[in-house]
Amino acid sequence: MMANNCNLVSVLCVILVLTLFHNPITVAGQNSPVVALFTFGDSNFDAGNKQTLTKTLVAQGFWPYGKSRDDPNGKFSDGLITPDFLAKFMKIPLAIAPALQPNVNVSRGASFAVEGATLLGAPVESMTLNQQVKKFNQMKAANWNDDFVAKSVFMIYIGANDYLNFTKNNPTADASAQQAFVTSVTNKLKNDISALYSSGASKFVIQTLAPLGCLPIVRQEYNTGMDQCYEKLNDLAKQHNEKIGPMLNEMARNSPASAPFQFTVFDFYNAVLTRTQRNQNFRFFVTNASCCGVGSHDAYGCGLPNVHSKLCEYQRSFLFFDGRHNSEKAQEMFAHLLFGADTNVVQPMNVRELTVYPVDEPMREFWVPPTPATVHASDSSSSTSRGYEYY
């Protein structure tokens, strides 16, 4: 009798294990995990749209771009970019397709990001965020239903080109003019996010701006030297970033219970700056110059046919592959932070948590200002800077 009971218990245990593996755990009220990833913004998220939009050949379609994977596919990296890794972590089996290319598979999301994109103005051979949103709306009816869109993640990185252009065109702008411009940019960002929300999107991942003054191309153009960043651009980026969290909090709190606005904010600024100042902790040995390019910081002309650019021997030791874009190694790190880091990096929840958060539930946690830490972005090659946690 005891033997029969043991056999029965064993059979029940096997059935339970098989049931658990066959039916993945889901959050109450959520029948399935996230179904797609949509990205918007500039060259950091461009999956190949620039190649379709421009009438000229783009360097990103040719070697040494894609060097790490022997696949120059129009992405501004030596290999994959952050959304590629994030999609893998989200169990999306397909690469995020460039939406502007014909005959691509957009069944699990699409990239609308284009190199040179801005929030304001009319960029040449590029698109504003508003134009990208309109393109999404044009494609929506034929490709994605409302339930699909509501459960998908919408990821945005935009604004860098606005501030780079403003600084170049207004070198003597005072604090008042800078503040007014930041307000214009962030107000436009809010309007464009609202337009996406009105189209049915509900889950947003907003990436703050990088420390723009520490980009190798900026250091090179403004002759900062090897150990200094251009603080005017960093200040503009910080002013911009400070407005993002409160803006999204307001949008979430004001959204109707029938269509909750859900979001998270990735502190990209400090994620980059930490690796710039504590480079050896992350096994980056060059953070103030590019792997590919020419000039004082090897930051210009990577891949251009009329430029004899230098190319480093080992790109994984560089934080930046070209003058504006991070190496694949760094991009993968950022994707890991987005997907699984704590609230020191991405808040009020990480992307893994956002994907399973019930789409019909209002947010109960919100963005809060980080603990102040005053550290200037100088001496970038040093590993002794203080004031930042390792993330």
UniProtKB/Swiss-Prot annotation:
Lineage of origin: Eukaryota, Viridiplantae, Streptophyta, Embryophyta, Tracheophyta
Name the UniProt record assigns to this protein: GDSL esterase/lipase 22
Glycosylated residues, chain numbering: 105, 165, 288
Keywords assigned by UniProt, alphabetized: Glycoprotein, Hydrolase, Lipid degradation, Lipid metabolism, Secreted, Signal
PANTHER family to which the protein is assigned, alphabetical: GDSL-LIKE LIPASE/ACYLHYDROLASE, INACTIVE GDSL ESTERASE_LIPASE-LIKE PROTEIN 25
Keyword Cytoplasm included in the entry's annotation: no
Database matches in InterPro entries: GDSL (IPR001087), GLIP1-5/GLL25 (IPR044552), SGNH_hydro_sf (IPR036514), SGNH_plant_lipase-like (IPR035669)
Active site: 43 (nucleophile), 322, 325
Species per Swiss-Prot/TrEMBL record: Arabidopsis thaliana (Mouse-ear cress)
Region (Disordered), start-end ranges: 372-391
GO molecular function per UniProt: hydrolase activity, acting on ester bonds
